[in-house]
Amino acid sequence: MSRGYSENNNFLNNNNQMVLDMILYPLIGIPQTINWETIARLVPGLTPKECAKRFDELKSSGSSPVDNQYNSLMAAGESPVETLATYIKSSLLDIHGEFQETPVGHDAVSKTGRHSIASTRNCSSESENCTTHNGGEMTEESEGPNMVIHVCDEAKNLKEDFTCPRDLLISEMKYFAEYLSMDAQRWEEVDISVHCDVHIFNWLIKYIKRNTKENKDCEMPTLEPGNVISILISSEFLKMDSLVEQCIQYCHKNMNAIVATPCNMNCINANLLTRIADLFSHNEVDDLKDKKDKFKSKLFCKKIERLFDPEYLNPDSRSNAATLYRCCLCKKLLTKETERRIPCIPGKINVDRRGNIVYIHIRDKTWDVHEYLNSLFEELKSWRDVYWRLWGTINWLTCSRCYQAFLCIEFSHCQYHSETVVYPTAASSLNTVGTGIYPCCNQKVLRFDPTQLTKGCKVRDHMVTLRDQGEGGDLPSCPTARMLDDLHKYRDVIVVPFSKDTVSDVGVGLCDEKGIECDVLLEPNTPWGPKTGELNAFLSLKNWTLQLKQQSLFSEEEEYTTGSEVTEDEVGDEEEVSKKQRKKEKPKKFTRQPKKQVSSPCAQRKEKALEKSASRDVSPFVMSMQKNKWDATRSLRFNQDAQREDDQRRMTEITGHLIKMRLGDLDRVKSKEAKEFAGGIYSRLEAQIKASVPVSARQSSSEKNTRSKSRFGQGRPA
């Protein structure tokens, strides 16, 4: 038979043949189904079909072909075939209640970790099949060899060993699957030691053995407020997913009782904290009774993180803070959702193609959201208040009184007038047609205001109607109703006090001082221009940008100088050109001080600077045009200085334009406003007044002053 075997099975070499025969011979006469895939894994280079074919040959022959080759081993008292038969019967067959007895020596070997690892590697697939055939019920026979876990409780100075079937340990505690894998290369000795509380690990062992026969009559271990945190942390480390979910659900339902126990909540990692926080609504977190603040602030911090998560669908907040930024013009905190609803300064009001007013905000790139949150925490002193303030910053509602969209933090900022507007008749004043006045504060208003911005001298709470488009008839369930309830419940933290916004009011209020200055500077001499206190709001909006440009030109002409106008080398050239002009101007401007012609050179320089600044205020554009040309009548030094000033002006304009593109209009305006007139604001006002008064009026006033002085001089005693 062995000769026929060698002829008919040329695909086997001698070593594989002997190993396969040793494995298959003990299976002869056993009626159970054999898992040929598991047997094929034991012998490299063989397929399940080849193993089955060889098994049929051995059954037909009826004797083992390797008995003669292993007589020496059998004579020594140890039969490898019998030893292997015990292993095969316990792990390679689909057994239904038979062969339940294991050798006594097997337990001793398994406790030391020997041979049990080999069994662990090879019986996993068969145990999976057993689970399938038995309808998912884990039996002791299909759970593989027992593994011993050494538990060390360093806090209590205790050590205890626990025994658990290998397959059950892997299926319940997936942490050990990596170390008890089926790779034949890892069939080394494994010693499992766990540093954990003995009572907690005992609870975990009872939990994973809850469906076994030996614990069928035992009570199911239960979660308690005192042990759920420790079990949660241990089960998460051991990758017991089902138990982790049970612990998280238990924490959600019994958090008040848990925080009252002396448990350490700092051991909960960020992943578990996020999963627990997602089960809580912000109202439930706020209602927690956590006197020592062991867990409440952590939940609110996670809620703040969720507000900034763009992919998270937050049931507590309709808006998201992922796009939060601050406008550098109106200083409001906005998101992509609120930037077109919340008004900015009048200069940034636009009209879309459908005729609706839209607002364009400019992002302040110097603002940082982390610094903002830290400053909020320093101000409010708790993460709970920080969350509610941030929630009110990103969520918005619409007022049914003023028909304006408002942020929840501005709930008490609905502006109104206590008295109705009064419009004068056409016969009373021709200059105020279409302009009314509020008697309560004397604020002027247009009859038809295109800006549609609500302004008032008093504030009150906004009024919100609970009608959501597309919502059902259940108002308490709609987002607007829930948001309004939260706003009323926590308004002491959410709502910020009202403060008059001077930046956003420019050009809107007709009695506003900045708006008056704007239009007076633009067109001071036009007969149809607005008078003091009678500004047109729409024109002030229209000319906002022009006024900023003209102010920047004024300040630039005052600043761009290298001192060439007052150098000693240039005095002669300037005297030749401007002698006649000064002779004509001196009787008009300096009749009060006739002795200035013999003053010091420093006084002459100051006088020239004042004259030049006054002439710049009168005609700034003409001065800039003259400096752009090379003057052949002047010296080389003068032209070089003028060219240098022109280059400096160009570079400053380029720099200012780049700053404007990067930081916005407001920083540009502030930088220009910081550069005052060379002689101060009063000298600028004086120059503007002198430029606006006709020459004849100035001449007559100067003559009157001269006559009065002469009369006083004659009346004095010698």
Curated annotation (Swiss-Prot):
Domains (record comment): The BTB domain is important for homodimerization and for its function in negative regulation of class switch recombination.
GO MF annotation terms: identical protein binding
Polar residues bias spans: 118-134
Compositionally skewed regions (Basic and acidic residues) per UniProt: 604-615
Gene source species: Homo sapiens
Record text on subunit structure and interactions: Homodimer. Interacts (via the BTB domain) with HDAC1 and NCOR2.
Ranges for region Disordered: 118-142, 555-622, 692-718
Family: Belongs to the KIAA1841 family.
Coiled coil: none
GO biological process: one example: isotype switching
Lineage: superkingdom: Eukaryota
Official protein name in the record: SANT and BTB domain regulator of class switch recombination
BTB domain: residues covered: 147-255
Biased composition regions of type Basic residues, renumbered to the chain: 580-595
SANT domain ranges (all copies): 21-59
The protein's role, per its UniProt record: Negatively regulates class switch recombination or isotype switching in splenic B-cells.
Acidic residues: bias regions: 555-576
